[in-house]
């Protein structure tokens, strides 16, 4: 059966999976969603014997129905290979009473690798399928991790260029170095004088600018997105929740059909939305627990039914979640409204004009699958410290947000289901924050010195991603103001 996609803001018009991947964002500013979420084509018991690559094919072929078996298997083989430092791709670590799904074993040691190692291949395959002659320009805003993972994925991929914008003082030193040292003739990195929301809004504005689209087309270019608004990012993320369940079955940690909970540190809502899709496919997930840092706009939304970004933006030690406009939430809003494109459009217009919106009581009742919590900066540091002291396991700041929220949820709800926590980045990526949580004496020390200390205390091997930036030369030093983003893109592409 052919699965088509439609915009959250227009129920009428449909496109194929490859067209949705190419476009990134729908013409009306909405996000592409499948007309229906497919069911898993195999039993849960059959999953447990499969490798990561086999589960990826089993899940993704249901969503990407216009890809041939050969095309999809080729994309998967190119993505999930020796770039990952473990054959399992996303191993589970049992620590205390939870299972940490380590999504940081890829090229840039963050969970974004899981989707961004395959997106370039899905995109170039989609371009061939749709006879696209233009060069594809990937335009991305990053709060730290997406940028590097996208750069690594697209570096020297034929027929593509990639331009990444990041907030000048809004990412960690390691994250910045990972980006500005990126090799590849088709890569560009730009620091903006502003925050992540400015970067994301600027990128979105360029996507929606018809005049710019025309100018680029005349020069032989067209935009696509590597941000989590692209369905080609979301579908590969569904895979690892299916895989986690399969691993628990294989390791006899759960019985077949036993329900589990999932906790996800959440910013842009893509990662937890993928878990929601896995649940809808038939994976027995009871609660989806949304973990926020002090930018707790999502926590407040789940508590009150009102989404309100009119608040102070807090810079925390978990920068990938320092987000007030959670763009993937729109896909959930659309679903809980009964797929009412008009209602979704009205709410998103309110968000744009007023900075807030409130959902109906009926819609709020459809959020029963979700629970939410948030962690303060002190709680994050204490969680890293306590779990290290008790078990020797070292986690990064984003994972600690989730661990703290899980602990509070478990105490409040008395829900003792087996729980998978999405561990979204390597502690090496945030060595400064992690080491000062373990012992305050490390506060303010040089990041690279702390990386060595972290290696000693954790007893883990230094990831390649860190070794690479130790001595790499800086290749990108462009900066611009928020209102110069469009001109900067034109300059990079040589468009007048």
Show which residues each predicted segment covers.
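PLP-dependent amino-acid enzyme catalytic core
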Residues: 1-496
């Amino acid at each position: 059966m052919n699965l088509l996609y439609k915009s959250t803001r227009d129920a009428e018009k449909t496109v194929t999976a490859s067209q949705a991947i190419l476009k990134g964002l729908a013409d009306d500013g909405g996000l592409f969603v499948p007309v229906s979420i497919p069911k898993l084509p195999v039993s849960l018991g059959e999953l447990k014997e499969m490798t990561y690559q086999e589960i990826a094919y089993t899940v993704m072929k249901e969503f990407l129905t216009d890809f041939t078996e050969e095309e999809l298997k080729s994309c998967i083989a190119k993505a999930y290979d020796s770039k990952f430092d473990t054959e399992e791709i996303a191993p589970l670590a049992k620590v205390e009473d939870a299972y940490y799904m380590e999504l940081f074993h890829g090229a840039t040691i963050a969970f974004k690798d899981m989707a961004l190692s395959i997106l370039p291949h899905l995109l170039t395959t989609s371009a061939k399928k749709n006879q696209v002659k233009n060069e594809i320009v990937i335009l991305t805003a990053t709060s730290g991790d997406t940028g590097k993972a996208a750069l690594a994925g697209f570096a020297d991929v034929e027929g593509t260029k990639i331009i990444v914008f990041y907030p000048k003082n809004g990412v960690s030193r390691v994250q910045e170095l990972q980006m500005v040292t990126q090799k590849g003739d088709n890569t560009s990195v730009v620091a903006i004088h502003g925050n992540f929301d400015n970067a994301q809004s600027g990128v979105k504005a360029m996507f929606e600018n018809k005049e710019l689209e025309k100018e680029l087309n005349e020069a032989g270019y067209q935009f696509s997105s590597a941000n989590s608004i692209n369905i080609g990012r979301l579908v590969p993320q569904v895979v690892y929740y299916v895989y986690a369940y399969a691993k628990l079955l294989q390791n006899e940690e759960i019985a077949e059909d036993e329900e589990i909970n999932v906790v996800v540190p959440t910013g842009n809502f893509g990662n937890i939305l993928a878990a929601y899709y896995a649940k809808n496919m038939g994976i027995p997930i009871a609660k989806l627990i949304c973990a926020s840092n002090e930018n707790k706009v999502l926590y407040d939304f789940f508590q009150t039914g009102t989404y309100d970004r009119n608040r102070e933006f807090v810079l925390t030690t978990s920068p990938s979640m320092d987000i007030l406009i959670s763009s993937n939430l729109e896909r959930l809003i659309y679903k809980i409204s009964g797929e009412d494109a008009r209602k979704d459009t009205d709410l998103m217009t309110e968000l744009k004009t007023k900075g807030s919106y409130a959902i109906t009581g009926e819609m709020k009742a459809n959020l029963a699958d979700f629970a939410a919590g948030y962690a303060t900066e002190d709680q994050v540091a204490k969680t890293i410290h306590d779990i290290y002291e008790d078990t020797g396991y070292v986690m990064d700041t984003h994972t600690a947000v989730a661990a703290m929220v899980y602990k509070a949820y478990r105490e409040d709800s008395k829900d003792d289901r087996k729980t998978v926590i999405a561990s979204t980045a390597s502690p090496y990526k945030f060595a400064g924050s992690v080491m000062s949580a373990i012992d305050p004496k490390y506060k303010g020390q040089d990041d690279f010195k702390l990386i060595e200390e972290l290696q000693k205390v954790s007893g883990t091997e230094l990831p390649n991603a860190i070794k690479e930036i130790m001595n790499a030369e800086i290749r990108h030093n462009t900066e611009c103001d928020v209102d110069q983003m469009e001109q900067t893109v034109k300059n990079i592409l040589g468009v007048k």
